[in-house]
Amino acid sequence: MDIGVRDGKVVGVRGRVSDRVNKGRLGPKGLHGWASINHADRLKHPLIRRNGKLERASWDEAMSLIVDKAHEVQSRLSNHGIGFYTSGQLFLEEYYVLAMVGKAGLNTLHMDGNTRLCTATAAASMRESFGSDGQPGSYSDIDYTDCLFLVGHNMAHTQTVLWSRVLDRLQGPQPPKLIVVDPRRSDTAKQADVHLAPKNGTNVALLNGLQYLLFSNGWINEDYVSKHVVGLEDLRTVVNRYTPDVVERITGVPVTQLHQAAEILGTTSSLLSTALQGVYQSNQATASACQINNINLLLGLIGKPGSGILQMNGQPTAQNNRETGCDGEYPGFRNFQNPTHIQEIADIWNIEPVKVPHWNLPTHVENMLKYISDGSIKMFWISGTNPLVSLPHLQKVRELLTKPELFVVTQDIFLTETAAISDVVLPAAQWGEKTGCFTNADRTMHLSQKAVEPPGQSKADMDIWLDFARRMDFQDKDGKPLIPFTSAEEVFNAWRKMSCGRPLDCTEMSYQKLAGGSGIQWPCTSVYPQGKERLFDDAKFFTDTAYCESYGHDLETGAPFTKSQYEAMNPAGRAILKAAHYQLPLEETSEQYPLRLTTGRNVYQFHTRTKTGRSKRLQEAYPEPVIQVSIADADALHLVDGEMVVVRSRRGSVELPVVIGDITEGHVFIPFHFGYFDATDDRARAANELTREQWDPVSKQPMFKSGAVRIEKCVQIEGGKTNHAKEKHTEAVRSVEKGKGMAEPADENGGHTGNKEPVRRLELWMGALNEGLEILVEIYRDLVPRLVHDLEVQSGLEVMRRLTTEVLHQFKPVIDRYHGSHQYGRTVAQYLQKAVFPAVEETNDPYEALAALQSLDLFLTYIEGHLTALSPASQALWDSEFVNVISSAQGSIQRQKAWVNQHIKVKSPQTLLVPTVAAEDLYDSQSSMAGRIRS
């Protein structure tokens, strides 16, 4: 896109005909969104809350306050008392600097972006199926494909330029077949050859049913699957339960339509599948997205012209957030469970590997809110996003972000709803006012160049974080500045080094090459100097154990697989078919809440309207939110078009006008764009007043398209309404103005929290582990020998006692350093010992011996649980000695459990199956077994 400038102001834009993505076309937001750049409401100066009110301040005042607060939180709570929540609308260079601030400077995992709300599932599904993030397909596949499969993707409203390419095909010679999955009769669905309209939350059942028909009709590409895919039989076993009749009962989709869609998919010569929020923000999001991947893999239609998968993005630069490791991933799509990958990051940043936070995946935003609620995060830095409109269950979010003890920094271009409750507001530059790169969903990277100066004292986000890094004096392991960059191009060149050898390798890209008139797809290497159009054309996937970004997850429980579990699948460069059964949504409809809620977008607005709501053309095109209701439900409720109604869920209520039609019966739709910055009355109107804070177990993406609501008529009477949903945002702003006063660091006694100094509980846990180990030595020495009369066991007990004593010896320096609290631990361990070893008298009963071994296994599990918790905690302390001690102890306890389990297996068949005791003796009042039964 080219920017028109006159007298230092943006005056218009035009599409660039030479560009490979848009071919010169622009959608409504592209054509008219630029108007917000010149809007009078732009933030132009930093603001600090003084005496309850946000007042103008200098950059030095604002940044000094932020740094002072960061130091205060560090000293009282550790670095883990600070959280970052960013955007999908900044540039690659800015995300990379922020990733370094958080992961290399503060060494914390508390970093996420609003990409969690829109594309976390896209990334997760590709990691599960292909071994790494990275879209297989290309936008050019639209021009070649014989079949388009759009699942939960209203492309006509969300990717208008891409949709224009689809319309070109549909209206041209040899149009492709179009299958659309959407409970609404959207503008996209109206063009479909087959429109499948399942009930909200039933995507897995529907997609399993389609796979069942591919299997049963022999439409699987057996040759491709046998050579390039693993997991076929597990998938076949699961989908065999999803016959068309079963699927119709679950989803409401007629059997005839299932057969029709499956036949088109099964017999097409090429297939481009896409997905978006109808999948990602719904029940079983990652499981559903993986089933879409499965369909292309089963047909062998991937990595070929016209054949691929686009797990779409929801924001212009969401891909870059993921690439740089600024949210839930690591830089360059590296695997946090792979020590080699962590070493690579550490080497590039020139820090010790222990300083790269990798004890778990980065903290997702809902968990950060939980930590804010608990009081363990006291500083929250928000950039380029507006959580007081965009997060689910808004009343809960308001309560948390307005806590007096929480220090909130918001960095944005306008005074958003979130900025209005913040302690410090930093004015940021937007596109056209700064230089940087961004990547499209099909891996095409563009360079966006600065055209005008930002208004007032606004700064590029990158420059704000570079200033913070300098003031915090972040250093590498040689004592040099950790983040020494002075320009976006310097950051980009540093990023090229980080990308080297990874799926997104950009080493042959440069600003000069990207300024050539069109974007370039990654990977861009010496082998592919002009980029690579589509991935997996050689059927080589990113699934080698040493290379993959993730070892995958159980799609139903969300539990991550270990390296050994992953290796057992033996993907070795092959794609992985991931299976999952359908599970009911946690909140179903009821008599009180009979309608299924779904939220989404309108073509003329974007996210929370921070920019589009300030474009006259876009705002006039869609000025107010509505609730879309089916004809049948409107008739049952006696509703008419335009009538105001109150919509209630278990969490809140809104008041909206009704629009009738084009949605499945039993469902309602509300656009999520609208908050309160330009509200003209006191109605609640934000869709997220209603939504639930439940997230997908794998991707941790919120399920905005879930939950149940009811509609109540809103009858007008003289002087007001009989039923009214009042907004609560204004009240939240007033509470901050009254309650926070001037934002400044807490005093030495704890500031807002009074005189009570918080105490960490690491010492309690360590003391409990130490005392548990001490008692385990006693169990090996005194208790088990009285209960298990077996020479082999007796000889092994001395080895077990020695192993435990060695762990205690290794643990002592760590205990001494951190001052473990022993009293609590000994009490708990003694209670546990008495509970699991109720029989303490000497016995020759083999059953008692077996029970004693089981009890020993339980006690070892107690020890193991303490070590499991201390493993990431020791890493979060960046204490290499502590990490090594815990790792060694875990190995020792695993050896002991293996020994115990083997003896249980040896003794159990003979003890449990062969009768040796008379019934009257078994239940005799004097027997220890009777004591167990009575207890």
Residue ranges with predicted function:
Residues 461-520, 608, 612-628, 632-742:
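Long, contiguous, secondary-structure-rich segments that constitute the structural scaffold
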Residues 96-167, 174-179, 204-208, 297-421, ...:
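Extended redox/cofactor-interaction regions of prokaryotic respiratory oxidoreductases
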Residues 1-217, 246, 254, 336-339, ...:
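N-terminal export/assembly segments and adjacent metallocofactor-ligating motifs
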Residues 791-831, 900-903:
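Conserved alpha-helical segments that form or flank metal/cofactor-binding pockets of metalloenzymes
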Residues 121, 741-748, 813-855, 916-927:
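Carboxylate-rich helix-loop segments that flank metal/cofactor sites and access channels
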Residues 754-789, 850-877:
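Alpha-helical bundle segments that constitute or directly flank the non-heme di-iron/ferroxidase center
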Residues 776, 852-933:
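Preference for long, well-ordered alpha-helical segments
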Residues 52-53, 212, 219-255, 334-357, ...:
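N-terminal leader/propeptide and maturation segments of large enzyme subunits in energy/redox metabolism
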